[in-house]
Structure formats: C-alpha cells, structure tokens
Design a protein with these regions (language model features):
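Active-site-proximal loop and beta-strand segments within enzyme catalytic domains
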Residues: 43-49, 66, 95-210, 217, ...
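Bacterial N-terminal signal peptides that target proteins for export
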Residues: 9-28
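An acidic site on a long C-lobe helix of protein kinase domains
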Residues: 156, 212, 278-281
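Hydrophobic membrane-targeting alpha-helices
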Residues: 37-38, 127
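Bacterial N-terminal signal peptides
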Residues: 27-37
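Catalytic loop of the DD-peptidase/beta-lactamase superfamily, centered on the K-T-G motif
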Residues: 39-91, 221, 226-233, 238, ...
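N-terminal intrinsically disordered, acidic low-complexity segments at the extreme N-terminus
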Residues: 4-5
C-alpha cells in the first residue's frame, strides 16, 4: 500500500525529520507523546566573539551536539563548517564503531542517504551542459526505455527538470525489492514501472520521489556510456578530491539505534540514497558550489548551473506555499533568519541521518553525518543553529528572535465544526476527525489530539493525555493550521516557524466498488522480502472509506493507515496529496485467485 506502509524504509514518519518541513511536522507530532514530562538539559549561553572569530560557534555547536547525543543515545556524529573556500572547523563525536571503541572523526565514512540526490542532479545538469540532455524535454527523449501509464493525458510530460524538483508526478517509490540486504541493480525500475501509473499530473504538487532519481541515474548511464557509479567517480569525486566517497550498494558501515548496533539494509535506488562519504569530502562539494562550479584548476560545473540549482523552480505553482525547490537542492526546511535562502538536503534512513545545508548569499555551509537512527531531528536543528551562529560571526547579523504571536482561543464556528468532521489524509497518514462533541478531536497513528481554534482564524494542536485531557506541548507551540480550497480540493495548510506547506486534505467519500468490498480482510506479500516487511496488512471499509492498515514487527506500537479512492472497478489510488499519494492499487487475477498488485508487490488474501 502507501510507501510508508509497505516498507519500514527511509521515509518512516517516526524519525524522518531531516529533509523538509513536512517531515519536521510529522516527527513533531509523533515525538510529542514521548516528550511530555521529560526533563531538559540546562541551556548553554551563546557567546559572541569578534567578527570572523568562529571559536564561540565551535564551542556552542559542540555543546549542542553532545547534549543531543546524550539525550537521544546517538552513537556517532561528525560535522564540518565551511566559510567559502575554507573548512573552518571539523570534528567527530562519539564512535564510528562502538563495540571496538573506534572514535568518530571527520574522516569517518557514513551513509549520507539522500544527499545523493544533489549529486545525481548535478550529474544530470553536467550532461545538459555537454549537450547530452535537455532537461526541459520529455524524459523519454533522453531515456527511450522509460514508459509509464497516465490518467492525465492533458498534462505536460515528465522531464529531467521536474524530476529534479520532485514535481514529476512519478510515484515516490517502486516497492519491489526497494529496501533489502542485497538489492538488485537500480535500473530495474525502468522496466518495472511500465504497468504503473503517474501518481499526479507533472508540475502539480511536490511529491518526493526516490524512483525519479533512479530514472535520472539510468539517464546518466544512457547518455554517458558509463555506469552510474563510474560516472560519478570520474566526473565529480576524482576532480573534487573526494577520495573516500563512492556510490555503493550494499553499504559496509556500522549503524545504531539507541547505542545498539542494528542491521544495515540498503535502498535499491542508489542514485537516490546510495552515497557513502565523510564530512571532509562533502565539504569539497560545498566549496565547489561556492566557487561557481570550480575546484582548483577544474571547472566541474558551470557558474550558470550552480546558480540554477539553487534557484526557486516552483514559485508559481498553487500548491507550493513555502515548500520551495531548487534542482536537487531543497529551499525549505532549514530556517536561518536573516541569512537569505537556505539550500539543503538531508539523508534519512532508518539507521542513519545526515544534513548538508548552505547559505548561498553568504557562502556559509555545514555538513553533518550520523550513524544513528535517533539523530533525525538533531541533524536539522544543529545545522540551523550552526549556520545562524556562523552568519553572526561572519557578518554581524544577529539571529532574529522568534516572534511568538498568540491569539486567544475561541469556540469553533459552525463552519469549522462542519469542515473538521470526517476522514483526512495528512502527513502522518489517515486521520479521523470528529466534531460531534463541539470540540475538534483527531486520532492519528494511535494518538489523540485536539485542534483548538483561535481568534486569528488559525488552529493549534493540543495532545490528549490518555486520549482524554488536552494539554499544550512545547513541540507544538509554533505549529498553526488553516484551511484553503485550491483547484476544488479542500486543503489543510500547516505552518511551522516561518514556512507553510500542504499538511493534508479532506477526503470525499465515494462509492466503493463491489469488487473491492469482496476483498476486505488480511493480506500477505507473495514472495520473501529480504529485508524489513510488515507482519500485518489489512484492507477494510471504514465509514464509507476504503482503508489500508499496516504494522511492522520492528515498530509494533505504530499503526500506519492510508485511505484508498477507487478510480474504476479494478483500480484505486492512495488518497491525498504529496509523497506516496496517488499510487495505484490494482485488482488482478493470478493463479486462479483474486490478488492485489501495488508497485511491484503482489498481495494475497490470508485464508485465516
């Protein structure tokens, strides 16, 4: 079913807090119940030195990292701070190998995860510079083998540009053999998706796609005559002096969860998340970006390309709000007040997290790599704090204090009570909302919340202890929700800090075809998955909505839910907007029985 439901993978809403605002909101919601009543470490006073003196930055960031590591049981952590062409500080904390007491250093190699997408996009742009690819032409021109079905014949094509900005309409993932011990070659997706559908019209909404990056990787191979890993080695890693960096599958690195070693699984989509590197090497890439594509005597990318990759690409699209995208780089999710645009990309795998973030206008950057499942929130927070402090040290621009504007609570209006009643697809999956009691109560991923209306028309969140008593939680204080109708769709807009984005959508009940109603029940995946897989998959009807529920043995307390909207007698799509939405569930006949097909997986109804 939906991507988070069928693989306990890089997009787990429990921990994936690093890449964009949507996952920051998700992690906040899910972390809140764990932080109620928790004691906090005393805050260290931020010191200010002379202009150009980064020693106070090093001191404060070291304290922040050590605090996060202690509070979240993070095993290994490395960081580098870059000012234009100079690495001003780099350090490792904790252990690369806990059992053998091998310390983490700046040279420690980690799984950099989705930072890979910046490199894959850079390779695509490099081939465009060389006249091999036109990023504004249909992808099929550069990759003739590419083929996928569509329900949007009037929409524009999938292009390399909209793939790089995650607006291609492609599914987020192709699930078959996605996250396993020994994955097949990533380019198997080219043939695999021929019977799949686009999830949305291209250039419609942000929908993060690992699949899209694998298609770009195949495009690089097709138009360069080299294997993807070889192309990256010859055209980026060697010219940049990144001697410890490579694209590899599987990854031979240690990983931990709460200081306990965990088995490392590999995302099949190497161009999307298969980068191995250290902070020393990644600093070289950042320096190249600041030097307009130059490294030493070599021009790796043109100045025009480096500027285009950090230029907002989706400003005019109605569902963008503040979720701005460059090419490969995300231009949202890391906030540095006064610093101008922040370009970043994080990497989030179940066992490790990373962040590479830059202030292009000031040529300041930070790279963070960690080998721990529990570092998801930390890598983003530390990156933002480090950039803010570096900005102050370099320019004298002081971090603007967060403006906390609180308006009085009020009773919800009749219109609000009407709107907030029913099923909503959100960043944390399917949410049931009820306003029958006169308040707006929501249930999501096994937790209970209350939506509180305010005089300014916005809504805030309270967590309901034991599902009964609504209380304010610090993690929710800067989250505000509002509603909007765009292209006929009833949208919930989420705002955290200074950034807004699509948080969810109200679902409209539609008749469920008899073919689907006959198939409600428990399911199993046919064929062994050599990696994490769900032990409970249920298809059910709930209040006129077709609902999928999944649990994983690794996280038995977490119930993941997604709604399906029928589009024909034999096809339904995951409901809502954004990543993992719009993907097709098909009824098929195989070996004389009715089965479900979803994104390369075949599901069979259990007999008992």
């Amino acid at each position: 079913m939906q991507n988070d439901l069928l693989t306990y993978n890089a997009r787990s809403p429990l921990e994936d807090h690093a890449i964009v605002l949507r996952r920051r909101l998700t992690a906040t919601l899910l972390a809140a119940s764990l932080t109620l009543g928790a004691c906090s470490t005393p805050v260290m006073v931020r010191e200010t030195g002379e202009r150009g003196d980064y020693r106070p930055v090093e001191k404060y960031v070291s304290w922040l990292i050590e605090r996060d590591m202690a509070e979240n049981q993070i095993t290994g952590y490395s960081i580098a701070l870059i000012d234009d062409q100079q690495v001003i500080w780099q350090k490792g904390f904790g252990y690369a190998d806990l059992e053998n007491k091998i310390p983490a250093t700046p040279e420690t190699v980690y799984r950099a995860g989705s930072i890979a997408k910046v490199f894959t996009s850079a390779a695509t742009m490099q081939l465009a510079e060389r006249g091999k690819i036109d990023i504004d032409q249909p992808l099929v021109k550069a990759l003739p083998e590419f083929s996928i079905k569509t329900r949007f014949p009037e929409a524009g094509p999938v292009t390399p540009r909209n793939v790089m900005m995650h607006h291609s309409g492609l599914p987020s993932n192709y699930m078959g053999n996605l996250f396993v011990r020994n994955p097949p070659p990533f380019d198997m997706v080219v043939a695999g998706i021929k019977n799949e559908y686009l999830s949305t019209p291209p250039d419609f909404v942000f929908s993060y796609s690992n699949l899209g990056m694998s298609l770009l990787g195949a495009t690089v191979e097709k138009n360069s005559g080299l294997g993807f890993a070889d192309y990256m080695e010859q055209n980026f890693f060697t010219p940049l002096g990144m001697t410890q960096t490579r694209f590899a599958s599987p990854a031979l690195t240690k990983a931990y969860d709460q200081n306990k070693e965990t088995e490392v699984f590999t995302l099949r989509d190497m161009p999307a998340a298969g980068l191995l590197s250290n902070v020393v090497d990644l600093s070289q890439f950042v320096k190249m970006q600041f030097a307009e594509g130059r490294s030493g005597t070599q021009q790796v990318l043109s100045p025009a390309t480096t500027h285009e990759m950090v230029r907002v690409q989706n400003a005019k699209l109605p569902l963008t709000f503040d979720a701005y995208m460059g090419l490969g780089w995300l231009l949202n999710g890391v906030e540095v007040p006064g610093g101008g645009p922040v370009a970043s990309h994080g990497g989030s795998l179940p066992d490790s997290h990373s962040m590479m973030a830059i202030l292009p206008e000031h040529k300041l950057g930070v790279v963070i790599l960690s080998n721990s499942a529990t570092s998801a929130v930390s890598v983003t927070r530390v990156a933002a704090e480090a950039l803010s402090l570096m900005l102050e040290a370099k320019t004298g621009i002081h971090p603007a204090p967060k403006a906390t504007v609180r308006t009085d609570e009020r009773a919800p209006s009749a219109e609000e009570l009407r709107f907030f009643n029913g099923h909503f697809d959100t960043l944390v999956g399917l949410v049931n909302v009820s306003s029958k009691s006169g308040s707006i109560d929501a249930e999501a991923v096994g937790h209970h919340f209350q939506l509180v209306t305010h005089e300014d028309g916005l809504l805030s969140l309270k967590y309901k202890i034991l599902g009964l008593v609504p209380v304010r939680v610090g993690l929710f204080e800067d989250i505000r929700l509002s509603t909007a109708t765009i292209n006929g769709r009833q949208i919930i807009v989420g705002k955290i800090g200074g950034e807004s984005m699509v948080f969810g959508e109200k679902l409209r009940p539609a008749p469920i075809p008899e073919n689907f109603l006959k198939l409600v029940g428990s399911y199993e995946i046919i064929g062994k998955i050599d990696g994490p897989s769900p032990d409970k998959i249920i298809l059910k009807e709930e209040g006129g909505v077709l609902v999928g529920e999944v649990r994983f043995p690794e996280k038995p307390e977490l119930l993941l839910r997604i709604a399906f909207q029928p589009v024909s007698d034999h096809e339904a799509v995951t409901a809502g907007l954004g990543s993992g939405r719009g993907d097709t569930l098909r009824l098929i006949k195989e070996d004389g029985e009715d089965r479900l097909a979803f994104s390369g997986l075949i599901l069979r109804k259990k007999l008992n």
